[in-house]
């Protein structure tokens, strides 16, 4: 192997500094480009586009009016559910969206159900328990209207808001 003289070594050093700088800049720019391209995978947002974030939940106004059965189906397609009647977020949702919307409360044959999962609900824990308990209808669904749960016909069409937890 032939050894290099001092001048050649000096030339390589002089050429190596700009080459190293170019390589460093190239690596940084490539890293930034990769980050921007894969931003959603690397740093997912809590809520998808169109969903509104509030207190570890994402809310979507579907801008559709439909019956309770269709509303539940629509929210399930979005991997979400109707708002529960016992959540403290109902008033906040009303102030954000400013419309009446379905909640997941239904009375069927004197049983109170969460229509998201067909499980029984203890209505004594709800804020307007006395008003709900006085309902004599065998079947009724409920909307949230101006700070209250209001009885309505299940087949009527009302606004649909869907809710889901972050990162689900």
UniProtKB/Swiss-Prot annotation:
Q: Superkingdom, according to UniProt?
A: Viruses
According to the record, which residues are glycosylated? 133
Question: Is ATP-binding one of the keywords UniProt gives this record?
Answer: no
The cysteines covalently paired via disulfide bonds are 75-162, 141-154
State the compartments where it is located.
Virion membrane; Host Golgi apparatus
Q: What is its membrane topology?
A: Single-pass type II membrane protein
Predominant cellular place of this UniProt entry's protein: virion
Write down any Gene Ontology CC term: host cell Golgi apparatus
Instruction: Provide the transmembrane region boundaries.
Output: 15-37
- Function according to Swiss-Prot or TrEMBL: Forms a complex with OPG162 and OPG190 to coordinate the incorporation of OPG164 into wrapped enveloped virion (EV) membranes and, subsequently, the production of actin tails. Therefore plays an essential role in efficient cell-to-cell spread of viral particles.
Assembly notes: Interacts with protein OPG161. Interacts with protein OPG164. Interacts with protein OPG190.
Family membership noted in the UniProt record: Belongs to the orthopoxvirus OPG162 protein family.
UniProt protein name: Protein OPG162
Q: Which organism is it from?
A: Monkeypox virus
């Amino acid at each position: 192997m032939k050894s290099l003289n001092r001048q050649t070594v000096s030339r390589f050093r002089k050429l190596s500094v700009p080459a190293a700088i170019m390589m460093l800049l190239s690596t940084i720019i490539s890293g930034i480009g990769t980050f921007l391209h894969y931003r959603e995978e690397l740093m997912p947002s809590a809520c998808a586009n169109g969903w509104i974030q509030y207190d570890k939940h994402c809310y979507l106004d579907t801008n559709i009016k439909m019956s309770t059965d269709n509303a539940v189906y629509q929210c399930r397609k979005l991997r979400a559910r109707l708002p529960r009647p016992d959540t403290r977020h109902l008033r906040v949702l009303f102030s954000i969206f400013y419309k009446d919307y379905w909640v997941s409360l239904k009375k069927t044959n004197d049983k109170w159900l969460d229509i998201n999962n067909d499980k029984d609900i203890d209505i004594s824990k709800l804020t307007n328990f006395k008003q709900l308990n006085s309902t004599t209808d065998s079947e009724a669904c409920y909307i949230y209207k101006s700070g209250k749960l209001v009885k309505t016909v299940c087949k009527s069409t009302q606004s649909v808001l869907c809710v889901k937890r972050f990162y689900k």
